[in-house]
Amino acid sequence: MNPNTPADVYYGQMSQGSSMPVTTVPSHSHYASQQPPPLLQPGSTYAHQYGTPQYGYANALSSPASIPPSLPPSMNSMAGQSVLPLPGSGSMNPAVYASGGFDTTGQVAPPGMKPRVTATLWEDEGSLCFQVEARGICVARREDNAMINGTKLLNVAGMTRGRRDGILKSEKVRHVVKIGPMHLKGVWIPFERALDFANKEKITELLYPLFVHNIGALLYHPTNQSRTSQVMAAAEQRRKDSHGQLRGPPGLPSLQQHHHHHSMLPGPPSLPSHPSMGRPALDRAHTFPTPPTSASSVMGPMGNSDGYQWSQQSMSGTQGNSSLSLDTSLGSNARSMPSTPATTPPGSTIQSMQNYPPVSQSYESSRQMYQGQSAQQAQYQSQQHYSSQPQHQERPVYSQSSYIKNDMGPPSGRPTGQSNDASDSKPPTGMIHQGQGQSDPGTHAGSEEDDDANNEAEYTHDSGGYDANRGSYNYNTQAVNSLPHDHGLAPEIGGSPHQAGSGRATPRTAAAPSSYYSAQGYHTPPRGQPSSSLYNVMSNERTGSNGTQGNEMYAGQADMPSSLPNGYSAQPSVMNGSSGGLKRGRDDDDDGGRPTTSAPNLGPGMDMKRRKTMMDGGSLPSPTYTATIAQAAPSAIAAHRRR
């Protein structure tokens, strides 16, 4: 390529004085339209601006007039120089043909000027930047829209900060960059405005070749083609990889690069298309894990497509379909897969909870009776039930109290002593026949067995069913109410140990049944008593075996000692009742099996244990108390029958 030919063409073009209308839009298409003759148009584009600079700053200060038109002869003198010598440092020094145009346009290199241009890829903006250094300040120019960093440009002019900021703020078209490398920060202004500023401040020659239109050609100087081609290729490769946009330098005469340049003009729309391709993956990554984590245990196997569809429905807000699919999967898999709290519907949970009580019919019926009716209603209902049976007239009243007492917990061994009297021993022994009578049949007399045959079925069923659950509530009332009255030590001293020993015999041996109910109101039972609470714990533990009549051994033990501490707790104090409960547990361990001697006459070993426990002041063990009850049962029953 002959370097002289382009220069001649330039000068002939300028001598004709041809001018082209100025395009004010700072777009790259402005330069693309000038490329078909790539080296002819740039010089004449700004030729008409020489005579009319028309430039003024915001502070009404105007720069001197533009450079006088004596520069073209100087450029003519430069025409003799074909190529500027390349410096030894390897910096790119192009031929004079690359700097055509007047000096005010920045197209022609000053005499002896060595253009220094570097190109870097501005990754944040996705554009290639050409950088020119002047006075130690780097001024950058974008390759895509030719905008120039006006802040750095005015810094080269030595302008104060206030004046510089005022000028840049008055610009209509500007792009503020606050993030990135230091030499790229600032206010970016269009190419024409930057050239005007440079001409007013007389820094156009200092900034050469910043304003050269085909500044990219400076990087492709034939003498330095190998290095510059590598730099540009690397820059464009990075730009293509990161942003999917490939754009050739504007000034390349190569047809291939020119073709790429025009074909990739709609490159900015391709930028959003690239992230949009990756967006569905991001959405799935953010939304898909949510449904499986909450319903993976019951939703069963689910394809990937179904999972993505589920998540997309949730994202779009159509919750109906997703919830339906989840519910159906729950219903189908609930039978075969274990339900977890996170996914089990509340309805199925409630049903499963309600299914347990019917296993024990007595417990279920007692619980319903306890919940549905008050204590007094249940008592009168029990009166009607027992009055219908062939018993004495007073039997319903006492059976009610006995039923209430037995409700509190398994009955004590007191009825074994009363079993001598066939008719009156039934109410207290209703529970005993179920518990102790089973565990220790030898402790009952023949008359007691007859009574069992007559009344155990109907009485034991009721008391067993209600004792299992309701007994503790009613018994708390009885035990607490017996304390404030005169039932403490007097019943035992008066020869009626039944009241003190067992809470179930209190109505018979104490006051009349009417006074028994009126004095000891069942509507407002005070509940703060350690013995009753301890007894509740023990009775609740053992009501299952007693009510269902499962294990005879433990059922009998539960019946005998559980009521004893409460019965004797009424005598000394509340604390004795609780301590009696502790001794009761100890005696249970000692008993193991019940004594097989007859109820009226227990062995001497039992008598010694009775003496020991009575001296301690605590509640009597079940065998000892059984002996005590057996001795005084006839008198107590007779007194109750006289009432």
UniProtKB/Swiss-Prot annotation:
GO terms for biological process: conidium formation; sporulation resulting in formation of a cellular spore. Residues 336-349, 368-391 have a biased composition (Low complexity). Pfam families: KilA-N (PF04383). It comes from the Eukaryota. Residues 1-37, 229-627 are annotated as: Disordered. PROSITE patterns: HTH_APSES. Residues 583-612 are annotated as: Nuclear localization domain. GO terms for cellular component: nucleus. It is found in: Nucleus. The keyword Nucleus applies. Disruption phenotype: Destroys the ability to make protoperithecia (female organs), but does not affect male-specific functions. InterPro entries: EFG1/Phd1/StuA, HTH_APSES_sf, KilA/APSES_HTH, Tscrpt_reg_HTH_APSES-type. Residues 150-171 bind DNA. Keywords: Conidiation, DNA-binding, Nucleus, Sporulation, Transcription, Transcription regulation. Residues 13-33, 306-335, 350-367, 471-481, 529-551, 563-577 have a biased composition (Polar residues). Its main location: nucleus. SUPFAM superfamilies: DNA-binding domain of Mlu1-box binding protein MBP1. Induction: Constitutively expressed during the mycelial, conidial, and perithecial stages of the life cycle. Residues 116-222 form the HTH APSES-type domain. GO terms for molecular function: DNA binding. Transcription factor that regulates asexual reproduction. Binds the StuA-response elements (StRE) with the consensus sequence 5'-(A/T)CGCG(T/A)N(A/C)-3' at the promoters of target genes. Required for rapid conidial germination, normal vegetative morphology, and protoperithecium formation. Belongs to the EFG1/PHD1/stuA family. This is Cell pattern formation-associated protein asm-1. It comes from Neurospora crassa (strain ATCC 24698 / 74-OR23-1A / CBS 708.71 / DSM 1257 / FGSC 987).
